[in-house]
């Protein structure tokens, strides 16, 4: 058997546990399924597993120019009148090319369309019986999670011993105890939890400015009217009297300045 030099060395070399026998002449004998089987012949076209296809020699007309046509492009004119780029090799006069076709003359209509025609599978009943068997029962999800937490699973072993694989069910977040209470101690935006020992509120951070309503949260270019109204509202409130005390003082000053002239006109 001629040795193929392109096969890598780790494939050609026999392992240490393979005993030397009659197949020493076959340098790839340790890859055969059966000892002394030899190399398989792939010269015959085969598809699938042990499918025997019978081929016969066929022929078909070769593409070329017709008689009396241009030898450069094959059109119906002389070569001297051709406007295409000259070919390095002139087009042939055609002919026949031989190839192999599948012998289907003696086959029926169904056999021609049967891809597995000619295949005798002794393992077909075993495959059909295995397909008819019900699938194995799926593993309980709770048992799988428990094994994963205990580190018995291969994935948990790869994850590492220091890091827990799955968060325990009894491990409850601390801020969830105060969600239903009257006051919420956890700020989800800043991720800050105020414990029992904290007195009062934490000082406002610069990055949290505007969240407590101390500043106007809007865009000036998008709504300039809102900014103008927000500026005028405090000034307008400062000018207007607040409460009954300021209203009485303003009335007394008006009576002292103008007297009862308004009543005398009536």
UniProtKB/Swiss-Prot annotation:
Gene Ontology cellular component annotations, sorted alphabetically: spliceosomal complex
Location of the protein in the cell: Nucleus
Organism annotation: Eremothecium gossypii (strain ATCC 10895 / CBS 109.51 / FGSC 9923 / NRRL Y-1056)
UniProt gene name: SLU7
Positions of CCHC-type zinc fingers: 68-84
Similarity comment text for this entry: Belongs to the SLU7 family.
Oligomeric form and interacting partners: Associated with the spliceosome.
GO molecular function list: pre-mRNA 3'-splice site binding; zinc ion binding
Protein name per the record: Pre-mRNA-splicing factor SLU7
Amino acid composition bias (Basic and acidic residues), ranges on this chain: 173-194
Function, as annotated: Involved in pre-mRNA splicing.
GO biological process, one term: mRNA splicing, via spliceosome
Lineage: Eukaryota, Fungi, Dikarya, Ascomycota, Saccharomycotina
Keyword Zinc tagged: yes
Top-level taxon in the UniProt lineage: Eukaryota
Alphabetized UniProt keyword annotations: Metal-binding, mRNA processing, mRNA splicing, Nucleus, Spliceosome, Zinc, Zinc-finger
Ranges of biased composition (kind: Low complexity): 195-207, 244-257
């Amino acid at each position: 058997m001629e040795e193929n030099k392109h096969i890598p060395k780790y494939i050609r070399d026999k392992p240490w546990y393979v005993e030397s026998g009659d197949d020493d002449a076959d340098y790839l004998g340790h890859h055969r399924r059966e000892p002394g089987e030899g190399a398989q012949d792939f010269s015959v076209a085969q598809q699938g597993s042990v499918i025997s296809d019978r081929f016969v020699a066929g022929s078909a007309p070769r593409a070329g120019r017709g008689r009396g046509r241009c030898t450069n492009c094959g059109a119906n004119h002389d070569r001297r009148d051709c406007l295409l780029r000259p070919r390095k090799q002139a087009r042939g006069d055609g002919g026949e090319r031989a190839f192999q076709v599948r012998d289907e003359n003696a086959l029926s209509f169904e056999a021609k369309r049967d891809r597995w025609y000619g295949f005798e599978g002794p393992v077909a009943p075993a495959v059909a019986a295995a397909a008819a068997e019900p699938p194995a029962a799926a593993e309980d999800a709770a048992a799988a999670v428990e094994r994963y937490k205990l580190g018995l699973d291969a994935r948990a072993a790869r994850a590492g011993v220091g890091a827990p694989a799955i968060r325990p069910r009894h491990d409850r977040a601390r801020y969830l105890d105060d969600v239903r209470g009257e006051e919420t101690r956890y700020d989800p935006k800043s991720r800050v939890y105020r414990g029992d020992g904290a007195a009062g509120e934490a000082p406002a951070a610069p990055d949290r400015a505007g969240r407590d309503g101390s500043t106007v949260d809007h865009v000036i270019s998008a709504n300039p009217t809102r900014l103008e109204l927000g500026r005028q509202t405090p000034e307008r409130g400062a000018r207007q009297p607040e409460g009954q005390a300021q209203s009485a003082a303003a009335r007394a000053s008006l009576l002292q300045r103008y007297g009862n002239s308004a009543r005398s006109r009536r």
